[in-house]
């Protein structure tokens, strides 16, 4: 490992502000940062969406472009040092519990389990051959690390993508690592490849797995919360509370609740309900904008009573009130507008309206509407 790498301060020892500042400095030098890099560097601090948005705005104000395209963005040494702490069981090619696969996939897992793993010296030898343009060496390096892809993909099962799709996305990340690996930096290929495989899988989950797209940085946060949740479930023998999760992650309970809410998958209104599947979820959800049956019935009765009362007025009085109060179309008119309709002055309309309202206030008519006004 290079001296420069040995002197790199571990991420865990840096404060969130130090990591943010380091990203800004790096962005100023390159002129660009990717969402993937920002998400990976800030993942240990579990920022919520508002905090991340605020920081991204700060990055933009510093004149740094933030890009979605992580294809050409290499991990820095701090990120690779973090990946070195990860360990995977490359001998276990079993299928995760609850995952159904077909025979071709089972055969694939069996075959890659037979491929010999590489020693550090063999990795370097292959890397040198790749540098010299040896295509066959690329294939050998990739083939020897297909187990690594499966091991990483297992950790993302249950996040909205099929196990096979996770493996395929991880394999794409592996091929990117093969293309870009520089053995002179002192890291093992598996360390370098782990970063690229993880990036490919998490980005695919963010882009494809959910009905509502979640930013990559929030996917990382959700993944961390799920790992903590599973660990606590094993320790406690029950589902942990948001308070317990927050204590483990060093997060306020409200932030945990927010993350859990974001992590929920939307449910289709077409989801069948009942044994016969003849009803759907949408049938049982109240339309807050719709008039309730009781209110609708009361409105229809009021309309009938109002029509009866208006029929006791002269045609002109009835029509003046209909226009003034918008009884037919919901649009009220001014005295002047009604006057133009009847070809009289606004003062004459006011007099007709006043006379009509006096008639309606008479007990013989008002008692018909009294119940609706209480």
Swiss-Prot record:
One GO cellular component, as annotated: cytoplasm
Q: Where in the cell is it found?
A: Cytoplasm
The UniProt keyword set, sorted, is: Cytoplasm, DNA-binding, Sigma factor, Transcription, Transcription regulation
Known DNA-binding region: 335-354
Q: Which GO terms describe its molecular function?
A: DNA binding; sigma factor activity
Q: Where is the segment annotated Sigma-70 factor domain-4?
A: 309-362
Tagged with keyword NAD: no
Enumerate the Pfam families for this protein.
Answer: Sigma70_r1_1, Sigma70_r1_2, Sigma70_r2, Sigma70_r3, Sigma70_r4
Q: What is its main location?
A: cytoplasm
- Write out the residue ranges of the motif Interaction with polymerase core subunit RpoC: 165-168
Cite the residue spans of the region called Sigma-70 factor domain-2: 141-211
Task: Please list the disulfide bridges.
Answer: none
Q: How does it assemble?
A: Interacts transiently with the RNA polymerase catalytic core.
Its biological purpose: Sigma factors are initiation factors that promote the attachment of RNA polymerase to specific initiation sites and are then released. This sigma factor is the primary sigma factor during exponential growth.
Q: What is this protein called?
A: RNA polymerase sigma factor SigA
Q: Which organism is it from?
A: Listeria monocytogenes serovar 1/2a (strain ATCC BAA-679 / EGD-e)
Q: Which gene encodes it?
A: sigA
């Amino acid at each position: 490992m290079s001296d420069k790498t040995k002197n790199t301060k571990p991420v865990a020892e840096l404060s969130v502000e130090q990591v943010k500042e380091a990203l800004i400095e790096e962005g100023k030098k390159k002129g660009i940062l990717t969402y993937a890099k920002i998400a990976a560097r800030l993942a240990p601090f579990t920022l919520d969406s508002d905090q991340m948005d605020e920081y991204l705005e700060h990055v933009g104000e510093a004149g740094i472009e933030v890009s979605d395209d992580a294809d050409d963005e290499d991990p820095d040494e701090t990120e690779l040092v973090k990946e070195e702490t990860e360990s995977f069981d490359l001998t276990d090619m079993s299928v995760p519990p609850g995952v159904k696969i077909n025979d071709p996939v089972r055969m694939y897992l069996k075959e890659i389990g037979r491929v010999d793993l590489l020693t550090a010296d063999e990795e370097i030898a292959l890397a040198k051959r790749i540098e010299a343009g040896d295509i066959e060496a690329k294939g050998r390096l990739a083939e020897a690390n297909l187990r690594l892809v499966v091991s990483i993909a297992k950790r993302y099962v249950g996040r909205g993508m099929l196990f096979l799709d996770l493996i395929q996305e991880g394999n794409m990340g592996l091929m990117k690592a093969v293309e870009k690996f520089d053995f002179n930096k002192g890291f093992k290929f598996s360390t370098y490849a782990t970063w690229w495989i993880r990036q490919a899988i998490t980005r695919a989950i963010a882009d494809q797995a959910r009905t509502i797209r979640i930013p990559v940085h929030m996917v990382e946060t959700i993944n961390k919360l799920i790992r903590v949740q599973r660990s606590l479930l094993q320790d406690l023998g029950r589902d942990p509370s948001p308070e317990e999760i927050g204590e483990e992650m060093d997060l306020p309970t409200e932030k945990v609740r927010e993350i859990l809410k974001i992590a929920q998958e939307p449910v289709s209104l077409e989801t069948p309900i009942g044994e016969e599947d003849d009803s759907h979820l949408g049938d049982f959800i109240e339309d807050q904008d719709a008039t309730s049956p009781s209110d609708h019935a009361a409105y229809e009765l009021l309309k009938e009573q109002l029509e009866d009362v208006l029929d006791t007025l002269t045609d002109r009085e009835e029509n003046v009130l209909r226009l003034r109060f918008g009884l037919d179309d919901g649009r009220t008119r001014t005295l002047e507008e009604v006057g133009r309709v009847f070809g009289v002055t606004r003062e004459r309309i006011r007099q007709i309206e006043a006379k009509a309202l006096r008639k309606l206030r008479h007990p013989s008519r008002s008692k018909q509407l009294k119940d609706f006004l209480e």
